């Protein structure tokens, strides 16, 4: 899309927003703005990281220590993007209508699903994931769709899809304002422990899944691991960033508590990320050592 088209679209959407704001006393358009921000903030953060990753594309693999430092740095940058977007959402919804729940934030489940979909699109435009090429035009997109829908599928792919589908069901089902997938007992115990030991209990999906995966994604790219591994880690990393933004959509929670909750999750997530990188490095070293021994014995 050209810059001229982007400007026309921007002014058109802005004008339409003003009209809707006047006609609905601001409630509907505020909900739309908040939902759009909750979706675009994590996507913008991930696109910014992708652009940073591309600066090292074509370069030689970096050392493990430098890659770990960059992984930690980029996690903090993404978290800052998420915090800015989250506080913007809190400012949009910070009025009596939403505090008294005469109006509600709508689309909580979309804030978890759409960022992942949009990041997939952004990734395909920037990295040669599909058959060693990127997708940057309508023709390439059509070719991708045709090839994807007509490719040969092995039986194990169905098991992988089933596992991913179960993970998505749990992930989405436990979001929103209504009860969905029940929380297991061991997780309730973990939550109570975190509530008793930390200023604000961080979200498990942030410090257990999202943040460590995002750090490992940066590490994987800097060390020139296979693109498919980097892609999967990037998608897992979106979960943590999107969760940080969604925290600010809970209007009953003071903004300061949301900030501290994100900070605590970032702190533990960064620690887990470093430990995960060390563990993966150790496993790779052990694997290489055993392979070298087998070669020597032969």
Q: Each PLM stretch: what is its role?
A:
Residues 4-298:
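Alpha-helical transmembrane segments of integral membrane proteins
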């Amino acid at each position: 899309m050209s810059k001229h088209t982007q400007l026309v679209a921007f002014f058109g959407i802005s004008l339409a927003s003003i009209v809707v704001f006047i006609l609905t006393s601001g409630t509907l358009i505020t909900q739309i703005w908040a939902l759009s921000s909750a979706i675009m903030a994590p996507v913008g953060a991930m696109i910014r990281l992708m652009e940073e990753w591309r600066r090292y594309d074509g370069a030689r693999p970096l050392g493990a220590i430098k890659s770990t430092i960059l992984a930690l740095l980029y996690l903090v940058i993404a978290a800052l993007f998420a915090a800015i977007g989250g506080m913007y959402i809190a400012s949009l919804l910070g009025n009596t209508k939403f505090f008294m729940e005469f109006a509600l934030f709508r689309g909580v489940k979309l804030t978890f699903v759409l960022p992942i979909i949009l990041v997939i699109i952004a990734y395909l435009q920037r990295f040669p994931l599909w058959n060693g090429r990127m997708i940057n035009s309508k023709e390439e997109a059509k070719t991708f769709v045709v090839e994807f829908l007509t490719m040969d599928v092995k039986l194990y792919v169905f098991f992988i899809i089933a596992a991913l589908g179960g993970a998505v069901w749990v992930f989405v089902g436990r979001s929103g304002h209504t009860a969905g997938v029940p929380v297991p007992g061991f997780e309730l115990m973990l939550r109570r422990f975190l509530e008793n030991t930390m200023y604000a209990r961080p979200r498990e999906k942030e410090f257990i899944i999202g943040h460590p995966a995002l750090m490992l994604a940066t590490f994987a790219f800097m060390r020139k691991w296979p693109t498919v591994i980097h892609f999967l880690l990037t998608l897992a990393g979106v979960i943590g960033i999107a969760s940080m933004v969604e925290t600010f959509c809970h209007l009953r929670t003071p903004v300061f508590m949301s900030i501290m909750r994100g900070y605590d999750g970032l702190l533990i997530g960064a620690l887990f990320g470093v430990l995960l990188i060390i563990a993966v490095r150790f496993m790779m070293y052990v694997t290489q050592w055993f392979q070298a021994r087998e070669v020597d014995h032969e």
